[in-house]
């Protein structure tokens, strides 16, 4: 059961006391801030900014001044918003018990200071020597009096002293104390009236409350914003959440493609249109390098040359098939070379017989097709051998199993499976291939 002497509402005398004190000894900004706290038990700092329209720095200076003088108290609370973000807010309120004690202390301190000034003014020096600047009080008048001349003379230089007007109090201290008591009498009356007031704990330490005026303005602003968003259409939905989003701040998408680089290069070239061939590919820029007859006889096939160049630009996917075909072609060329070697003496004999003929018959006779065919086969065989030497891929051992050098280069996991001896052989083979390439 609650104590009947405990008040659950702040008496009007306490509110008037706070208003009198704040208006009598502080500025208008302090009075406005305290008026809000008198009307509302506990107010958030942001709400006070909204009501007073002060700058945040100015408002905090005013509140810190009042808090330093123990007129108000501050309480910090951590609040969680709807989006899960936590913020700290300062709530200010008046502890009326502390306010009464502070007012009593400050008034008593002022009264004591006035009494001290009164006591000091009665004991100040009232006589001063114009020569040696010695000062004397009223209690030393018997020492200064000279009965022969009937004057007050200095005890050091025997010069007649003068009354020290600068040491005289400008105002009577007893008058100041009387005026102080007269002006502070309304505050004294309120203090006597609130002497035995006992306030409940929820009044001394109030909980935060919402200001009705601010609530109405916020509801009206929310309604207006909702209507504006509906009228604006769907393009305003992107601005619905103004808070920053950090979901994708530390997310990195890495795509690892295990396909061959040749496929990627070919895919990138598919969407591009074929460019016109430059003049040095379409025809020779060297005068007399190739004759028209050689072009017609098939000595140089420009279309085949173009296809070969395009084939070099994009590597062949069927490398294994081409390797098998080249090996088969080599075997065929070797068999044909054996048959040509058997017919070579006959050709040589025919050539020696033809030497006895005249030069005129040599010019008129057509070229022998057998010799041309043999010469062409030899050239083709040499070209095939050179191409095969270039096309042959060295064999590398990986954990005792044979693999081609190109396959190991494209699959780094095979290198990890090598023994130290196999890895040294693999590195040495790569160095030799690199040296052969630039020799």
Swiss-Prot record:
ZnF start-end (C4-type): 129-157
GO BP term, example: transcription initiation at RNA polymerase II promoter
Family as reported in the entry's similarity comment: Belongs to the TFIIE alpha subunit family.
Name the UniProt record assigns to this protein: General transcription factor IIE subunit 1
Locations listed in the record: Nucleus
Positions of modified residues (N6-acetyllysine): 67
InterPro entries, per database record: TFE (IPR039997), TFIIE/TFIIEa_HTH (IPR017919), TFIIE_asu (IPR002853), TFIIE_asu_C (IPR021600), TFIIEa/SarR/Rpc3_HTH_dom (IPR024550), Znf_RING/FYVE/PHD (IPR013083), Znf_TFIIB (IPR013137)
UniProt-annotated stretches for the region Disordered: 333-392
Phosphoserine modified-residue sites: 268
Lineage of the species this protein comes from: Eukaryota, Metazoa, Chordata, Craniata, Vertebrata
Compositionally biased spans, kind Acidic residues: 354-364, 379-392
Predominant cellular place of this UniProt entry's protein: nucleus
Ranges annotated as biased composition (Low complexity): 333-344
One term under GO cellular component: cytosol
Alphabetical list of Gene3D superfamilies matching this protein: 6.10.140.1250, Zinc/RING finger domain, C3HC4 (zinc finger)
Binding site for Zn(2+): 129, 132, 154, 157
PANTHER family hit by this protein: GENERAL TRANSCRIPTION FACTOR IIE SUBUNIT 1 (PTHR13097:SF8), TRANSCRIPTION INITIATION FACTOR IIE, ALPHA SUBUNIT (PTHR13097)
């Amino acid at each position: 059961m609650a104590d009947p002497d405990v008040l659950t509402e702040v008496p009007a005398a306490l509110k008037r006391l706070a208003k009198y004190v704040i208006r009598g000894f502080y500025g208008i900004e302090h009075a406005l801030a305290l008026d809000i706290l008198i009307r509302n038990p506990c107010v958030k700092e942001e709400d006070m900014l909204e009501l007073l329209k002060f700058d945040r720095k100015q408002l905090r200076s005013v509140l810190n001044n009042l808090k330093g003088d123990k007129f108000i108290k501050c309480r910090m609370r951590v609040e969680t918003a709807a989006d899960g973000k936590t913020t700290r807010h300062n709530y200010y309120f008046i502890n009326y018990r502390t306010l009464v004690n502070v007012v009593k202390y400050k008034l008593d301190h002022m009264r004591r200071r006035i009494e001290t000034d009164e006591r000091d003014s009665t004991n100040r020096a009232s006589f001063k020597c114009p020569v040696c600047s010695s000062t004397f009080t009223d209690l030393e008048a018997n020492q200064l009096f000279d009965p022969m001349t009937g004057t007050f003379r200095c005890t050091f230089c025997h010069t007649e002293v003068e009354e020290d007007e600068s040491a005289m109090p400008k105002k009577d201290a007893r008058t100041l104390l009387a005026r102080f008591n007269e002006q502070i009498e309304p505050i004294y009356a309120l203090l006597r009236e609130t002497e035995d007031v006992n306030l409940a704990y929820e009044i001394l330490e109030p909980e935060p409350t919402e200001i009705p005026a601010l609530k109405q303005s916020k509801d009206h602003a929310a309604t207006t914003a909702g209507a504006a968003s509906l009228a604006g259409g769907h393009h305003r939905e992107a601005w619905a959440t103004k808070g920053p989003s950090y979901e994708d701040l530390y997310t990195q998408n890495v795509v690892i493609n295990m396909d061959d680089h040749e496929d990627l290069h070919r895919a990138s070239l598919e969407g591009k249109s074929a460019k016109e061939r430059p003049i040095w590919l379409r025809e020779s820029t060297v005068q007399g390098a190739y004759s028209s007859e050689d072009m017609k006889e098939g000595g140089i096939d420009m279309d085949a040359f173009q296809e070969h160049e395009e084939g070099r630009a994009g590597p062949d996917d069927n490398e294994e098939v081409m390797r098998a075909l080249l090996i088969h072609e080599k075997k065929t060329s070797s068999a044909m070379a054996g048959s040509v070697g058997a017919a070579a003496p006959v050709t040589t004999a025919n050539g020696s017989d033809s030497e006895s003929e005249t030069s005129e018959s040599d010019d008129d006779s057509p070229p022998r097709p057998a010799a041309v065919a043999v010469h062409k086969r030899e050239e083709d065989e040499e070209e095939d051998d050179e191409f095969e030497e270039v096309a042959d891929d060295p064999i590398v051992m990986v954990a005792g199993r044979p693999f081609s050098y190109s396959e190991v280069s494209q699959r780094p996991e095979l290198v990890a499976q090598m023994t130290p001896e196999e890895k040294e052989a693999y590195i040495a083979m790569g160095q030799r291939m690199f040296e052969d390439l630039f020799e």
